Amino acid sequence: MKGASGAVKKKPQVLNEAGEAETAVETVGESRKISGDGGFGSDDGGGGGGGGSGESILREIGDDRPTEDGDEEEEEDEDEDDGGDEEDEEGEGEGGQEERPKLDEGFYEIEAIRRKRVRKGKVQYLIKWRGWPETANTWEPLENLQSIADVIDAFEGSLKPGKPGRKRKRKYAGPHSQMKKKQRLTSTSHDATEKSDSSTSLNNSSLPDIPDPLDLSGSSLLNRDVEAKNAYVSNQVEANSGSVGMARQVRLIDNEKEYDPTLNELRGPVNNSNGAGCSQGGGIGSEGDNVRPNGLLKVYPKELDKNSRFIGAKRRKSGSVKRFKQDGSTSNNHTAPTDQNLTPDLTTLDSFGRIARMGNEYPGVMENCNLSQKTKIEELDITKILKPMSFTASVSDNVQEVLVTFLALRSDGKEALVDNRFLKAHNPHLLIEFYEQHLKYNRTP
């Protein structure tokens, strides 16, 4: 049956008032009337039926269904709103008052085609049966729907681009969308970096400024020294606030200065007294009574507090202590008998020619139990090398090491024994001058 809609439900046949058995067959967008003798009603009256205006309308005696034009308008609205889905006719709601059209055995009325799929290489359509709920929809193969080819063509046309349909393909934005996402991420990272830089500059602006020049008297010297270091680091960070990693470089520079032997020679060792200490020199730029005309610095004897938390490996970074190790045999021979008049705490002379208690981890610093004697300045630096006293040579790791002991004159006028290792670390110019004065050579024949 060409005009009949193929389906899968059974409906009872109904006799109209004239006693004629009519078979109602409807298609989406088309309804035809089949008379008892099997003729179709058409526009031109062909097929054995009477003529009608527009498409033939399925009617029963006493049936008040809307015209075909109204049905077409409803179908157009359904195509626009639901993408090809069709709603039930208005007369469907009045099914309780009037009887359904009669269908042949094995034929069922189709309301709409919902979806399309391909299973095992075969096309299937999801059919909505009129008068049945959505849960009763079934997937029908194309072979079962040959009688409603026009309905299938209309559904396929609704799936084409440019027309509303159930399937809506996702639009591919192309590579430009990825570029936009990358630009957004980049801008976000730049904003975060700018915020971190601004916060760093604000934090650095609150750091303390450089204090006044250091004074070498009293217990506030160590605190001033620490403040000066912190101010130096803060100024370096402010000057390079554009880079977050510059603070680490400033710390490395500070550590390099701690290991610089030349700077340590001018600074001299540090002594702590009740949590505070003093340096022999404030640095290269320190001037005053503590600097002699020959460029050497004076020693400020302080009491060494054993309970001070500053005692430890912090000041052991000095290059002289790491580079030259104390020789036990030399230190035993360097005790001078001329130190009888000193206090019992200061009667030990170390291998470097300076007075210090045995076991003192800061060689060259003089200890005194009485804090009132801190105003007495005793110059203990070596001022002149008098003559060599002994010579020892040793070989370690196939390298010959020579140790020469000299009799030297201290700044207090007393003589002391020192070795060439100490002179290399603390008084290299005196050692070089002595070598130049006593240099001898023989001409080769």
UniProtKB/Swiss-Prot annotation:
Protein name: Chromo domain-containing protein LHP1
UniProt remark on domains: The chromo domain specifically binds to dimethylated H3 'Lys-9' while the chromo shadow domain is required for dimerization.
Disulfide feature: none
Compositional bias segments (type: Basic residues): 163-184, 312-323
GO process terms (BP): cell differentiation; chromatin organization; flower development; heterochromatin formation; multidimensional cell growth; negative regulation of DNA-templated transcription; negative regulation of flower development; negative regulation of gene expression, epigenetic
Organism: Arabidopsis thaliana (Mouse-ear cress)
PROSITE patterns per the UniProt record, alphabetical: CHROMO_1 (PS00598), CHROMO_2 (PS50013)
Primary residence: nucleus
Region described as Disordered: 1-108, 156-218, 267-291, 308-346
Bias kind Low complexity: ranges: 17-28, 198-218
Knockout consequences: Dwarf plants with early flowering and inflorescences termination with floral structures in both long days and short days. Phenotypes of the lhp1-3 mutant are enhanced by the disruption of EOL1, thus leading to reduced plant size, early flowering in all photoperiod conditions and altered leaf morphology, associated with an increased expression of H3K27me3-positive genes.
